[in-house]
Amino acid sequence: MPGPNPPIEPPVEPAIDPAAYRAVAGRFATGVVVVTARAGGLDHAMTANSFTSVSLDPLLVLFCPEKISRLHAAVLEAGRWGVSVLGEEHEEVSRFFATRGREVSDRLDSWSCHRGPRTGVALLDDAIATLECRTHAVHDGGDHSIVVGEVIGVDLRRPEARPLLYYAGGYRGLDRPPGGE
């Protein structure tokens, strides 16, 4: 009588090349926002395309800041943050807030902003829309955190405006084809 069959070992998965992963992930078009928080008496801001709606009941959204970013620390400290949805004319704004290494005080002085009535955070005056959020939960996401916020204020400022999109490593508008910078 033959003995029991040896266990079948699952195949070893080859490592995924980070460049290949980025190329694939970059084929998912996203909107572009600027996320802001105020902590230690200073405004903090960064461009994000990792922003999405999560739930309607309760009203929840999320974004994913890099754990080493100043905004990450500010959001954790303040517990309140804002989102300014960028229009297709805001590519310069997006690039400005995406630049690493700038002093915090230089980030918002160049753009017209107002304070959110519920959070006191800076929100861009000419954003398509703004949201004010209170941190609901923070989850580990590798080198980023997944910050879930309860939406406590919204303002649809320019409903006719067209959104700024990010796709395949570049900015797009609804009418601009890939490669049509």
Predicted regions mapped to residue ranges:
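Basic, polyanion-binding surface patches
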Residues: 1-181
